[in-house]
């Protein structure tokens, strides 16, 4: 497991990431999602980019058996 250190700088808390897990230099802002005691950092406005640009796709059977919502018939206007 890779570890990072947390420290105070002025009145803010900062995280020092090891070189092997640093964000690229063009990333200047991050979104922070809180899940219990976890903090999940993602490049701001790019959280879906990595999914769509990733070479790995979903499996061929992804959502094959999803339920189709029933659409009730409406009265004519």
UniProtKB/Swiss-Prot annotation:
Family matches, as PROSITE patterns: SPOVT_ABRB
The record's note on quaternary structure and interaction partners says: Probably forms a complex with cognate toxin VapC2.
**Annotated consequence of substituting residue 61 to A:** Increased antitoxin activity for VapC2
PANTHER family to which the protein is assigned, alphabetical:
ANTITOXIN VAPB1
Family, per entry: Belongs to the VapB family.
The transmembrane segments are none
The entry's stated outcome for residue 66 to G is:
Wild-type antitoxin activity
GN (gene name): vapB2
Q: What positions does the domain SpoVT-AbrB occupy?
A: 4-46
Q: Which UniProt keywords apply?
A: Toxin-antitoxin system
Q: Which Pfam families match?
A: MazE_antitoxin (PF04014)
Q: What does this protein do?
A: Antitoxin component of a type II toxin-antitoxin (TA) system. Neutralizes the effect of cognate toxin VapC2 but not non-cognate toxin VapC2.
InterPro entries with a match to the protein in the record: Anti_VapB2-like, SpoVT-AbrB_dom, SpoVT-AbrB_sf, VapB_TA_antitoxins
- The identity of this protein, by name, is Antitoxin VapB2
Per the entry's comment, what about the domains?
The C-terminal 33 residues are required to neutralize cognate toxin VapC2.
Per UniProt, what is one GO molecular function of this protein?
A: DNA binding
Q: Which superkingdom is the protein from?
A: Bacteria
């Amino acid at each position: 497991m890779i570890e990072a250190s947390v420290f105070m700088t002025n009145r803010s808390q900062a995280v020092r990431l090891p070189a092997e897990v640093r964000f690229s230099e063009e990333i200047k802002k991050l979104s922070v999602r809180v899940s219990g005691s976890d903090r999940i950092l993602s490049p701001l406005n790019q959280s879906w980019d990595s999914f769509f640009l990733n070479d790995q796709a979903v499996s061929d059977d992804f959502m094959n058996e999803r339920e189709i919502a029933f659409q009730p018939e409406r009265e004519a206007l």
